């Protein structure tokens, strides 16, 4: 949705997160709340489709969206996806590889700057010059950063890369005859996190196939199948990190640069004088665990349209859409144990553990949505007059359910399953929701030679 920024008049797009897979924008029209999104005539979600599948996008404001009822109070975004055409088969392939990076970088203070600040704090509190926390010789050692007792570790460079790659590939085929038209699409998108390698990724796959055909002279039928699967895989990183939202504040800026990146014994994790041990531990899936969320969405749409031979311009149409969603979250947190090292004595000392104990949480969710639309459409021009009308009945039935379980105190995190945790710490929960809505819609348009116009709309909803 963030790609719509600057593309449509009156549409305000605000990206609230840069995390791969969560970089969708909040949209509003003329500064109001979130608009209603209609995809191919049915309410939908922009995050479920790939930009390459979109044929056109338009906006309805004010009274022009009244046919969609109270839900259109903040405006309507109309999206039409691509379909087949009366042409020879055409195959299109598009690919792109981009690099994403920060436009502005705020780096944490290094050891030298921290020491200066501590001296300033001491002196501003009425301290004595000769008893400042750090002498000039020590400040110089921090600046050089070569003495193991006066390190100047750059935690930012250790875990953040300048650019994170993103790739997008899609292939489509379009074709058909006057009688039958078809369209197929497959797209793949991958984004990597800006943290150093082995810190996770986001993958998304989109598939679509549709066709329409004239069964008889006045009868046209068709179907459209869309499938989307995505996988959000991030480091767990403890209670400060979670799914990535608090990383910058909780990890980078609280790490102490006076501690080393790693220890001579590579099997041990270096301490960084912070609540959750070390940024090196937090961003590495092998060390801290992972937050892995998989979503599957499949949408089937079928329609039949019949043009009356008795009333010119009158068509009857039935449109049925069925959507199935499923999600599975596996959130494995591995507790970190951290050490310090005294080079002179060649001694390793236990420094602490990450706050959260080792745990595993699994969430399962499913949802279905059935939409049925039955309509009569009338459209005719005669002697400078244009008359069009719509009468529609629409019903929506939605079911959702989910459950989760969590267990803690793993004796070993080698086995990443519930059975390896302490059964006495297990907690479970579940929930479900069901709702439905029926709507009756009517619209009448009349104009005479595009000079005089009348439009009337009526809609009733019950839930």
Residue ranges and their predicted role:
Residues 102, 147-187, 191-198, 206-279, ...:
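Flexible loop and strand-edge segments within Gram-negative outer membrane beta-barrel domains
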Residues 7-10, 17-25, 35, 76, ...:
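Residues embedded in well-ordered regular secondary structure
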Residues 161-178, 186-187, 277-331, 359-381, ...:
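Outer-membrane beta-barrel transmembrane strands
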Residues 113-151, 242-279, 334-356, 399-428:
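Surface-exposed loop/turn segments flanking beta-strands in extracellular/periplasmic regions
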Residues 2-42, 46-47, 55-56, 65-85:
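Extracytoplasmic beta-strand/coil segments of soluble accessory domains associated
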Residues 13, 42-44, 62-65, 80-82, ...:
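Short beta-turn/strand-loop junction motif enriched in small, turn-promoting residues
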Residues 39-40, 60-62, 151-157, 191-194, ...:
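Extracytoplasmic loops and strand-loop junctions of Gram-negative outer membrane beta-barrel proteins
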């Amino acid at each position: 949705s963030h790609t719509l920024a600057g593309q449509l008049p009156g549409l305000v797009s605000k990206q609230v997160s840069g995390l791969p897979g969560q970089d969708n924008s909040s949209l509003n029209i003329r500064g109001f709340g979130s608009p209603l999104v209609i995809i191919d005539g049915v309410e939908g979600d922009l995050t479920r489709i790939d930009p390459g599948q979109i044929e056109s996008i338009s906006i309805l404001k004010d009274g022009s969206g009244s046919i969609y009822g109270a839900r259109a109070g903040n405006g309507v975004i109309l999206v039409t996806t691509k379909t087949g055409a009366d042409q020879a088969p055409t195959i299109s392939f598009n690919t792109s590889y981009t690099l994403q990076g920060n436009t502005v970088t705020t780096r944490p203070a290094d050891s030298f700057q921290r020491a200066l600040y501590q001296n300033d704090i001491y002196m501003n509190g009425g301290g004595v010059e000769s008893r400042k926390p750090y002498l000039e010789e020590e400040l110089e050692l921090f600046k050089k950063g070569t003495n193991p007792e006066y390190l100047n570790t750059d935690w930012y460079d250790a875990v953040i890369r300048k650019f994170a790659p993103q790739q997008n590939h899609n292939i489509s085929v379009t074709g058909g005859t006057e009688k039958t038209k078809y369209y197929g699409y497959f797209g793949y998108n991958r984004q990597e996190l800006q943290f150093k390698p082995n810190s996770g990724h986001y993958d998304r796959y989109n598939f679509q196939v549709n066709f329409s055909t004239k069964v008889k002279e006045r009868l046209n039928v068709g179907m459209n199948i869309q499938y989307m699967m995505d996988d959000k895989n991030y480091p767990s990183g403890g209670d400060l990190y979670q799914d990535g939202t608090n990383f910058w504040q909780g990890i980078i800026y609280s790490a102490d640069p006076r501690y080393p990146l790693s220890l001579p014994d590579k099997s041990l994790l270096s301490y960084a004088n912070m609540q959750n041990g070390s940024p090196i531990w937090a961003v590495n899936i092998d060390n801290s665990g992972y937050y892995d969320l998989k979503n599957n969405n499949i949408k089937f749409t079928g329609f039949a349209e019949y043009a009356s031979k008795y009333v010119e311009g009158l068509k009857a149409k039935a449109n049925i859409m069925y959507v199935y969603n499923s999600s599975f979250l596996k959130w494995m947190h591995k507790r970190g144990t951290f050490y310090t090292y005294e080079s002179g004595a060649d001694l390793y000392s236990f420094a602490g553990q990450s706050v959260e104990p080792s745990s595993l949480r699994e969430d399962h969710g499913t949802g279905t949505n059935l939409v049925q639309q039955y309509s009569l459409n009338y459209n005719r021009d005669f002697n400078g007059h244009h008359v069009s009308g719509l009468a529609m009945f629409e019903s929506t039935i939605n079911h959702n359910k989910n459950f989760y379980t969590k267990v803690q105190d793993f004796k070993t995190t080698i086995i990443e399953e519930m059975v390896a945790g302490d059964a006495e710490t297990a907690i479970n929960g579940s929930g479900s929701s069901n709702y439905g809505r029926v709507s009756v819609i009517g619209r009448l348009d009349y104009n005479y030679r595009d000079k005089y116009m009348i439009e009337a709309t009526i809609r009733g909803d019950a839930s």
